[in-house]
Regions:
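N-terminal membrane-anchoring/stem segments of glycan-assembly enzymes
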Residues: 2-50
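Juxtamembrane C-terminal module of membrane proteins
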Residues: 33-53, 260, 280-292, 333-397
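Cell-envelope/extracellular polymer assembly enzymes that use nucleotide-activated donors
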Residues: 52-55, 85, 232
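Short, acidic, metal-binding catalytic loop of nucleotide-sugar glycosyltransferases
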Residues: 72-83
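A conserved acidic beta->alpha catalytic loop
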Residues: 73, 90-99, 117, 144
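Conserved donor nucleotide-binding strand/loop of the catalytic core
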Residues: 83-87, 98-131, 182-189, 193
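Short aromatic/hydrophobic "clamp" motif used to bind/position activated sugar donors
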Residues: 137
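Catalytic donor/gating beta->alpha subdomain of glycosyltransferases that bind UDP-sugars
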Residues: 158-190, 224-229, 233-296, 360, ...
Length: 397
């Protein structure tokens, strides 16, 4: 072998091992590290039965099939009626959502607002917060149903002055039989494990948009077009030196048919790129090294994973003459074949996690590539280039 060929082999080997190590760390090493640290350094939240004034905020867009049930769910939650207000907004819906909100408002069940044109979730949330009178703001997706005692459980965490954000549990109700929802549920069980581990340290990155609450004074106006605010809002609170925690007693569930789909994953990936663009421009990260470490490990590595996958696969293919890399290439090929088999609904249903896990992993990362392509071509970005100052992130001094 020529010296040049040896150098190419060395570079290919480095690409493989660095890529494989980062993928393994991002999806296995980091969650286990958070789990171990959470057990060692866990300081329980000081919960108590408190009843501050609470505002439950529900933005909705074309949720006509579920909005009436959502409103009934909200008004029947166990919380003193004189301490709870429910605010629901229709964001330019073209179905029966607006009419249902108007009916509920006229009946005195909620405070509602119906926008004639779509303005985006961030703009609607800004308006709802402006209308709200509660000391605690609780956000909930229109498509989710909240268990009756969840508000009381959520609010009890705010008895601890260290806590600024509390997330409830997100539960996906499996209602289809094609395996797609099963793959989504598998992912959410994994993600819940990661967030619970982070929460034991008081540093949970992101909350479940299905149900989470914050202290009112910690809400900063969102730039119109902001995506994935259920990640950005908790991070702003963490940067101010307050805790973001998890409460398994507060539960919100959603029909799996509302959640599955490749286009939805593309939208979430675009939101993740937006988060990164916003947060990495914020000053003060060096004063929050632990939070920066979590951001890099939990979020940045996830965004890099599609490229790490391609690099690892290509480098092992280049080094195919070596027995060790031949095994690695074969293992990756089998994994990708399993993912392709998962495209078939019958095989996905019968294969269980053996098919569902590779299928969902590859789907999520393929969505990340499509999302980045759209960003580069500037198609369908909405407010992807929101100004970083709009979130008013202030690092703790």
């Amino acid at each position: 072998m020529t010296p040049q060929g040896a150098r190419v082999d060395t570079v290919a080997a480095l690409v493989f091992w660095i890529g494989a190590a980062l993928i393994a760390y991002g999806y296995v090493g980091y969650p286990l590290l958070m789990h171990v640290l959470g057990r060692i350094r866990w300081r329980p939240t000081l919960r108590n039965e408190i009843r501050p004034r609470l505002s439950l905020l529900v933005p909705a867009y074309n949720e006509g099939h579920v909005i009436k049930a959502k409103i009934q769910n909200c008004v029947q939650l166990e919380y003193p009626k004189d301490r709870l207000e429910v605010l629901v907004a229709s964001d330019g819906s073209t179905d029966a959502t607006g009419a249902a909100i108007e009916d509920a408002t006229n009946a005195g069940l909620i405070r509602g607002i119906v926008y004639p044109i779509r303005r985006g979730k961030a703009a609607v949330l800004n308006d709802l917060v402006g209308m709200a009178s509660g000391e605690i703001l609780v956000f909930s997706d229109a498509s989710t149903m909240v268990e009756s005692g969840s508000l009381r459980a959520l609010v009890s965490n705010f008895a601890d002055p260290r806590v600024g954000c509390v997330s409830g549990v997100y539960r996906l109700e499996i209602s289809d039989h094609d395996g797609k929802a099963g793959a989504e549920a598998l992912y959410w069980r994994y993600e819940t494990f990661v967030r619970q581990s982070e929460a034991r340290l008081g540093r949970m990155l992101g909350a479940h948009g299905a149900l989470y609450g914050i202290r009112r004074e910690f809400f900063s106006s969102l730039e119109v077009g902001t995506r994935n605010e259920d990640f950005l809002i908790p991070v702003t609170i963490l940067m101010k030196g307050y805790q973001s925690v998890y409460d398994r007693r507060a539960v919100a569930s959603e029909d799996s048919r509302e959640m599955t789909g490749f286009s939805r994953r593309i939208g979430l990936a675009m939101g993740n790129y937006q988060q990164l663009a916003l947060l990495l421009k914020v000053r003060g990260w060096l004063r929050n090294p632990r939070l920066l470490f979590q951001l890099l490990s939990h979020k940045v590595l996830r965004l890099l994973t599609p490229f790490l996958i391609l690099g690892t696969f290509a480098s092992s293919a280049y080094l195919l003459a070596s027995p060790g890399y031949r095994i690695a290439f074969t293992a990756q090929t089998v994994f990708f074949i399993a993912a392709l088999l998962g495209v078939n609904t019958q095989l996905r249903r019968r294969g269980g996690a053996v098919i569902a896990a590779p299928y969902y992993f590859c789907m999520v990362n393929a969505a990340g590539l499509v999302a980045l392509r759209r960003i580069v071509r500037r198609k369908g970005l909405g407010g992807l280039h929101a100004k970083p100052g709009a979130l008013q992130l202030v690092a703790r001094r």
